[in-house]
Curated annotation (Swiss-Prot):
Residues 20-98 form a coiled coil. ATP binds at residues 282-287. The keyword tRNA-binding does not apply. One of its GO terms (biological process) is proteasomal protein catabolic process. SMART domains: AAA. The lineage of its organism: Bacteria, Bacillati, Actinomycetota, Actinomycetes, Catenulisporales. This is Proteasome-associated ATPase.
Length: 594
């Protein structure tokens, strides 16, 4: 037993020396447990002493378990504190770092070096090994560290200044551009622009990064795109009624030179440069121009045997070209003809269509408060004359005031062919009605019964009755009484002011009446009474439209030329009843704004 006491005292000494360390305490307790176990074995013959030792062992084991759990919690706390300290240190180091700069990659010079542009200077710097060789592209944005070494690569610049392309230089990688104040700059073409395959044209708007001198992309200019519609309209000559003679003339002027160029060359016949379509409103001028482009595309495809042949229809909205800034309208006209030349150089026929031509190209010197036509007209004249040596381009103009267009535009050699689009007569009106009133429409049973159920005969009879109502010289059809300057008077009927647009409107009114009858009385189908009633409604609606304040100008727009008109009196009794005519007040001086 004395030996065992010595072991306990030795263990107690070790415990005292390690009281400040939890690990030392655990070791001490484990050793004491081992000593007690030995004592337990030695005291196997002494039962009472063994029970006391066993109780002591259990107490020590419970103490060890508690200290172990406490130790694990302390270890976890220390680990968490260490992680927080490391994160804070990293954050402090990150915040203490100097700012990173950006530059534009210019060229890879090998051996891990590259030329960049940053801070207004061109520099040769090292490239980080983390960036694979050959991945940097000219014009690309790169990140620089404190030592101005390339450490990361990004995309390409997406903001900057808008410049206008003047020309591509011989090396193909640089271009001459003009800025806002017409200053000229030589810039580099960024790789995305070179690889995009976009054909750069003089006048294109480009995105430039002014500090590095790179241009990155072509910016569409809405001011030009809105004025030009390159799609060929899906309208054929079959959809146009009552204008067979005019269609034949324009086909001879436009299609023959492109379909049979050898015959024209053999006869030394020069194709016409332009066509003027003139006449009163609503008679199909714009419709014919659209059909020309569609028909020309199909004819060229038939002759060449290829479905890939295109024709281009450049639809120029006249009033939208006008700009208050001097030279802007002329610039737009140049861009339009520049685009026409580009398309024509590819072998495709191009039609440049000016709608409402009188709004742009008025007679020079006729302006009251503006003289823009003094420069716009010469610009068009020079462009048309410039088309002389260029094949596959023709100019088509449409106007209802051809008397206001400058005579220099209308002379032979510019707009060679002049086609008047007349108001439809009775036969033409039947043809136009036939485009809108067809056998596919639902027809009333009573009307069908009158013609033995034959839909074609029913439609023909309905059109015949409607045209007779419109073109008969009866009192209900009297529209205006005009007084000329020489005192003569003339009665005009609604037929004198009929148009394809009015006929379409009459048919639409009749169809609407048929729908209302079906909803109210459950009687389905179009009737001749609907068409006749629509004629009356259309005539009534047009009663107040004649301009009695300046009847001569109104008559010119409506297609009535000749002796000057001084008075107009409407003969249709309107809602107010009585005479609605007014005489013309003669004013000595109206000033420049009237």
């Amino acid at each position: 037993m004395p030996a065992h006491d010595d072991d306990i005292r030795e263990g107690a000494g070790r415990s005292a020396r390690g009281s400040d360390d939890l690990a030392a305490q655990v070791t001490y307790l484990e050793q004491e447990i081992a000593v007690l176990r030995r004592r337990l074995r030695d005291a196997a013959d002494a039962p009472r002493g063994g029970r006391a030792v066993e109780e002591r062992i259990n107490e020590l084991q419970a103490t060890v378990a508690g200290l172990t759990s406490q130790n694990e919690r302390l270890v976890a706390t220390l680990r968490e504190a260490r992680d927080q300290i490391v994160a804070l240190k990293e954050e402090i180091d990150r915040l203490a770092q100097p700012p990173s700069g950006f530059g534009v990659f210019l060229e890879d010079v090998g051996e891990g070096n590259a030329d960049i542009f940053t801070g207004g200077r061109k520099m040769r710097v090292s490239v980080s090994p983390s960036i694979e060789g050959g991945t940097l592209r000219p014009g690309q944005e790169v990140m620089l560290n404190e030592a101005l070494n390339v450490v990361a690569a990004f995309g390409f610049e997406s903001v900057g200044e808008i410049v206008s392309l003047k020309e591509i230089l011989e090396d193909g990688s640089r271009a001459l551009v003009t800025g806002r104040t017409d200053e000229e700059h030589v810039v580099r073409l960024a790789e995305p622009l070179l690889e995009s395959g976009v054909k750069l044209r003089p006048g294109d708007a480009l995105l430039m990064e002014p500090r590095s001198g790179y241009v990155y992309e072509v910016i569409p200019k809405s001011e030009v795109e809105d004025l030009v519609l390159e799609e060929v309209p899906d309208i054929s000559y079959l959809e146009i009624g009552g204008l067979d003679g005019q269609i034949e003339l324009i086909r001879d002027a436009v299609e023959l030179p492109y379909l049979h160029p050898d015959l024209f060359k053999e006869h030394k016949l020069r194709p016409p440069k332009g066509v003027l379509l003139y006449g009163p409103p609503g008679c199909g001028k714009t419709l014919i121009a659209k059909a020309v482009a569609n028909s020309l595309a199909k004819k060229v495809a038939e002759v060449t045997g290829s479905d890939n042949v295109k024709s281009y229809f450049l639809n120029i909205k006249g009033p939208e070209l006008l700009n208050k800034y001097v030279g802007e309208t002329e610039r737009h006209i140049r861009l339009v003809f520049q685009r026409a030349r580009e398309k024509a150089s590819e072998g495709a026929p191009v039609i440049v269509f000016f709608d409402e031509m009188d709004s742009l190209f008025r007679t020079r010197g006729s302006g009251i408060s503006s003289d823009v036509e003094n420069t716009i007209v010469p610009q068009l004249l020079s462009e048309i004359d410039g088309v002389e040596g260029l094949e596959n381009v023709i100019v088509i103009g449409a106007s209802n005031r051809e008397d206001m267009i400058d005579p220099a535009i209308l002379r032979p050699g510019r707009l060679d062919v002049k086609i008047k689009i007349e108001r439809p007569d009775a036969e033409a009106a039947k043809d136009i009605f036939g485009k809108y009133v067809t056998t596919e429409l639902p027809l009333h049973a009573d009307d069908l019964a009158e013609h033995s159920g034959d839909r074609q005969e029913t439609v023909t009879a309905m059109i015949q009755a409607t045209v007779e109502r419109m073109y008969s010289e009866i009192d209900e059809n009297r529209f205006l009484e005009v007084t000329y300057a020489n005192g003569d008077k003339e009665v005009m009927y609604f037929r004198d002011f009929n148009s394809g647009a009015m006929i379409q409107n009459i048919v639409d009114r009749a169809k609407k009446s048929a729908i209302k009858d079906f909803l109210d009385h459950k009687q389905k189908g179009l009737r001749v009474s609907h068409l006749l009633g629509a004629c009356v409604d259309e005539f009534k609606e047009n009663e107040d439209l004649p301009n009695t304040t300046n009847p001569d100008d109104w008559a010119r727009i409506s297609g009535k030329k000749g002796e000057r008109i001084v008075f107009i009196r409407t003969l249709v009794t309107g809602k107010r009843g009585g005479d609605t005519g007014r005489s013309i007040d003669t004013i000595a001086s109206t000033g420049q704004y009237l």
